A protein has these predicted regions:
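Flavin-dependent oxidoreductase catalytic cores
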Residues: 59-373
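N-terminal targeting leaders characterized by basic, low-complexity, disordered sequences
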Residues: 1-26
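Core hydrophobic alpha-helical transmembrane segments of single-pass membrane proteins
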Residues: 42-51
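Compositionally biased, low-complexity segments
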Residues: 4, 29-31, 46, 55
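Juxtamembrane cytosolic interface motif at the C-terminal end of transmembrane helices
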Residues: 52-60
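Compositionally biased regions
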Residues: 6-9, 34-36, 51, 267
Length: 373
């Protein structure tokens, strides 16, 4: 066997098939060719990765528009415009949904301890008995007829009740009928009223609604628990931010267990408010706990739904919580123009805008926006 080295320790010399030595210069040509190929492949891979990253971030950060089609859980929405809840508007829903609103949130439907008197001549919307299912079912059928979706707002009147029984977290006078005293809620009252909300959600599902909203704003009963002014409790439902949120969180959990995963569960909560001692930390904590409890959608309002100041008046608080939560958030309050809606969507994580009074004034405003955009 022929040795291809001169002596031990000397440089290894390769030979060709005929036994002739291969010059060192020729030996180095192949590695150079391999290195060049590897460089080209690396450049191509870098270009592919760069293009992929570019399109990923372009899609991820694409500016939202009013007329985007979106998916809310299992709902395919035709745009980002909702009709927000406002009292005594059930008969106007058809006029609104046939003009291209994507989703309707009804006026508050009382879940229990219903009261009525001459102080409320029209009376509130009701869902505290199965006998009201046929009535509310008509609204769901109207919404679906026009390719819109509908959510039933569930409310307990609390201190805005005008006759007994009047319940509150810690007692006090009524807010509408100031001559009556409210009853501080016992644990049994809390559990009973939580079940009222659950039964209301079950009835909404039977009536064909796409979801329900827990009304936890505007000084209704659930709203009062978030307020240090009205909630002086020292048990599990008062004191800390987490405890003040417990009532609405338990309602959401129980509703989810009762109606399953397909139904949308939304909540309307109060923005921070100095006069009613609703803190920013409480506002944020409530949002986080509701998200953990299985909430699908959130709307931000306030103890006083009609605020003074620049429109849209809940935008800053809504923007803040939308940056923290992963669930979609609705901005409502004082939105009247396309430019406002467009700005809100393009400059925040807010997913949807809702109008109430403006849609009542101009039921075809969404169509006008589309034609003039």
């Amino acid at each position: 066997m022929k040795d291809n080295t001169k002596d031990s320790g000397e440089e290894l010399i390769n030979i060709d098939e005929k036994g002739n030595p291969i010059e060192k210069e020729n030996q180095e040509k192949k590695p150079k060719s391999n290195s060049f190929t590897k460089i080209i492949i690396a450049i191509i891979l870098c270009l592919i990765i760069s293009v992929a990253i570019y399109f990923f971030f372009k899609c991820k950060h694409k500016k939202k528009t009013v007329f985007d089609e979106t998916t809310l859980k299992n709902l395919k929405l035709k745009n980002r415009v909702f009709f927000g809840p406002i009292s005594h508007t059930a008969e106007k829903i058809e006029t609104i949904v046939k003009n291209d609103v994507a989703l309707v949130i009804t006026e508050g439907a009382v879940v229990g301890d219903y009261t009525f008197s001459k102080l409320q001549p029209e009376g509130p919307f009701r869902i505290d008995s199965d006998e009201y299912i046929p009535e509310i079912k008509k609204l769901a059928e109207i919404a679906h007829k026009y390719n819109a979706y509908i959510i039933l707002d569930l409310v307990h009147q609390g201190l805005i009740s005008v006759e007994q029984p009047v319940y509150s977290p810690s007692g006090g006078k009524g807010l509408i009928n100031t001559e009556i005293d409210s009853k501080p809620m016992t644990k049994e009252d809390i559990l009973r009223i939580e079940d009222y909300f659950v039964q209301g959600a079950i009835r909404a599902k039977k009536a064909g609604y796409d979801g329900v909203e827990i009304h936890g704003a505007q000084l209704t009963l659930v709203s009062l628990f978030s307020s240090k002014k009205f909630n002086k409790r020292t048990d599990d439902y008062g004191g800390s931010d987490e405890n003040r949120a417990r009532f609405i969180v338990e309602i959401v959990k129980k509703i989810r267990e009762a109606v399953g995963d397909d139904m949308i569960i939304s909540a309307k909560i109060d923005a921070p408010d100095k006069d009613n001692e609703i803190t920013e930390s409480g506002f944020i904590t409530t949002g986080k706990l509701l998200q953990e409890a299985g909430l699908d959608l959130m709307e931000v309002s306030g103890p006083n739904p009609i605020r003074q100041g620049e429109d849209p008046f809940f935008y800053n608080d809504t923007k803040k919580i939308a940056e923290i939560l992963k669930i979609p958030v609705i901005c409502i309050g004082g939105i009247k123009k396309y430019e406002q809606a467009d700005y809100i969507l393009k400059n925040s994580n807010i997913e949807y805008i809702a109008m109430s009074r403006e849609l009542l004034k101009q039921p075809d405003i969404v169509k006008k926006w589309y034609l003039n955009k």
